[in-house]
A protein has these predicted regions:
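P-loop NTPase Walker
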Residues: 1-135, 263-266, 275, 285
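Conserved helicase/translocase P-loop NTPase motor core
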Residues: 118-122, 224-274, 284-290
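Walker B catalytic acidic pair
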Residues: 279
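Conserved small/polar residues in nucleotide/adenosyl-binding loops
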Residues: 295-301, 307
């Protein structure tokens, strides 16, 4: 990144001097200034609730735009909730409009930045490239009630004689939904779960206390989980083939697309010079994969990634 013409403090001072809205502009701390003026390499910011994350991210955008490092439409902001996305988008637009009223920044005519949720971005990525997998991803993601109904239909019509489970139908549906969600989230195949389950069952049988009630309960649960796996696979394949996708499905498929097709990453990097991530969850394997560089397996070093947590 080239030398900045304006420091964060100078930009804030110019805004504070404006007679109409100057009183709305809060001063920044040294720590916030360092975050706002950081380079274009990935960076992690640890900040608690109420510490001024939204304002700092907004000022980061002002700094980049004021110094010509990026235009508003080259900045992508991702948040965890729609509420947070709305708040950040409104704050950025407001600050950019205020900046454009200063004589030095009259040339700034656009205040449009791409601020959305992680799931919405995944849905957009999937809709643009779903044809690569031959699926229909134009429909809105299914809600919990619709997903539950499909799971109920799969469970009630399951006819595999090898399936063994004495639980109530409602419990099986709940287990089916929970296991499929975890498999999508952590990108685990049914065959891998079954292999590990069988290995653990063998080890349980070798334990000296393998006949006690606790050990038998664990073994029983693992056998039931393994017997549930074919049903989970059928549930997931049915929805994928019909385009009946949940938010978790969209995130998982978007991650697959980002990882398996190098040109997708190239296209996205061409759109956005800067990426700001709010409440980034590195415990979500799909989210990590979607936002990672396919070659280096890390967040793209050509972009700025501010990660307030």
């Amino acid at each position: 990144m080239t030398q900045a013409k304006y420091t964060p403090e100078q930009i804030i001072a110019k805004l504070q001097a404006h007679p109409k809205f100057g009183s709305q502009i809060k001063p920044i701390t040294k720590h916030q200034s360092a975050i706002i003026s950081s380079g274009l390499e990935p960076a992690v910011v640890i900040a608690g609730a109420g510490s001024g994350k939204t304002e700092t991210m907004s000022n980061r955008v002002l700094y980049l735009v004021a110094n010509g490092f990026a235009t508003p439409d080259q900045i992508l902001g991702l948040t965890f909730t729609r509420k947070a996305a709305g708040e950040l988008s409104i704050r950025i637009r407001k600050r950019l409009r205020q900046l454009s009223q200063l004589p030095e920044f009259k040339h700034i005519t656009s205040t449009s930045t791409a601020v959305t949720t992680y799931h919405s971005y995944a849905g957009k990525l999937l809709s643009e490239h779903a044809i690569r997998y031959g699926i229909d991803a134009d429909a809105e993601p299914l809600g919990e009630a619709a997903i539950w109904q499909i799971a109920s239909d799969v469970v009630r019509n399951w006819s595999d004689d090898s399936y063994r489970n004495d639980s109530a139908v409602s419990t099986v549906i709940k287990d089916l939904l929970g296991l499929s969600k975890l498999m999508l989230e952590h990108q685990v195949k049914a065959s891998d779960i079954e292999a590990i389950g069988n290995e653990m069952l063998e080890k349980l049988q070798l334990l000296a206390g393998s006949t006690n009630e606790d050990t038998r309960a664990v073994a029983r649960a693992m056998r039931q989980r393994n017997s549930l796996l074919p049903m989970v696979e059928a549930f997931m394949e049915r929805r994928k083939a019909a385009g009946e996708l949940s938010f978790d499905d969209q995130m998982s498929l978007a991650a697959d697309i980002a990882q398996n097709f190098e040109d997708v990453g190239t296209l996205e990097r061409g759109k956005y010079k800067v990426v700001l991530l709010d409440e980034y969850q590195d415990t979500s394997q799909s989210q990590v994969r979607m936002l990672s560089d396919r070659k280096s397996k890390r967040l793209n070093s050509s972009q700025t990634c501010a990660l307030p947590i």
